A protein has these predicted regions:
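Bacterial N-terminal signal peptides that target proteins for export
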Residues: 1-9
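Hydrophobic alpha-helical targeting segments used for export or membrane insertion
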Residues: 8-17
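Conserved long hydrophobic alpha-helices within structured protein cores
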Residues: 11, 46, 81-85
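Bacterial Sec-dependent N-terminal signal peptides
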Residues: 16-39
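Residues in and immediately flanking transmembrane alpha helices
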Residues: 18-19, 63, 100, 140
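Boundary/entry segment of secreted carbohydrate-active catalytic domains
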Residues: 32-77
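Substrate-binding cleft and catalytic face of glycoside hydrolase catalytic domains
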Residues: 77-194
Length: 194
């Protein structure tokens, strides 16, 4: 029960922290430190968390702590609490958003978080929103750059974007176990076309 409360606290902190976000800088190229060779047993049942806002939260000064009040890097802390899978959302051009996402969760940001998760032995899910911002039941807007595309052009853009992100991950040696196509798409996606 104590472990569940710790996981619930961390998940709540991540979710709550996403409500108080800041802007990213204009640099879209992540820096990848040397990979440390460490092996973790992350097999079996998937126990995961969506940490898509992590880099933005860290940029805003958020810190994460153990139950003993010792500061610890978030993904490492989640792993120590029993997590073995990470979900990361990817948007097409979040720089086009005028509200709250402004550059976070683009390909470079996702690569950086996936690289960190990979080095900790996490199983990784990539969630393609196929939008410049949140995609959920109330909004499934096409990316601004795709707004006037025909159905054929849209199909090609989806394929190209998906291949681009997954190829970039593969190039860094990052294995993706799951790919989620769209987010909360039970009413469709890529509106008004889809």
């Amino acid at each position: 029960m104590k472990r569940f409360k710790q996981i619930l606290f961390i998940a709540s902190a991540l979710l709550g922290g996403s409500l108080f976000t800041a802007c990213s800088d204009d640099n879209d190229t992540p820096v990848f430190p040397e990979k440390e060779e460490v092996t973790y047993d992350m097999s079996g049942f998937a126990r995961g968390a969506d940490v898509s806002w992590l880099t933005e939260m860290e940029s805003s000064g958020y810190k994460f702590y153990t139950a003993e009040e010792k500061e610890q890097e978030c993904m490492s802390l989640l792993r120590d609490l029993g997590m073995n899978a990470i979900r990361l959302r990817v948007w097409v051009n979040p720089e086009n958003d005028t509200d709250d996402v402004r550059g976070w969760c683009n390909k470079g940001d996702v690569l950086l978080k996936a690289w960190r998760a990979h080095n900790l032995g996490y199983r990784i899910m990539i969630d393609f929103h196929y939008s410049d911002r949140w995609a959920d039941p109330s909004q499934q807007a096409k990316p601004q750059a795709w707004a006037d595309y025909s159905v054929e052009q849209l199909k090609q853009a989806i394929a190209d974007h998906t291949k681009d992100v997954l190829s970039a991950l593969k190039e860094k040696g990052i294995d993706v176990e799951w790919v989620q196509v769209g987010n909360e798409t039970h009413q469709g996606m890529l509106f008004p076309t889809g």
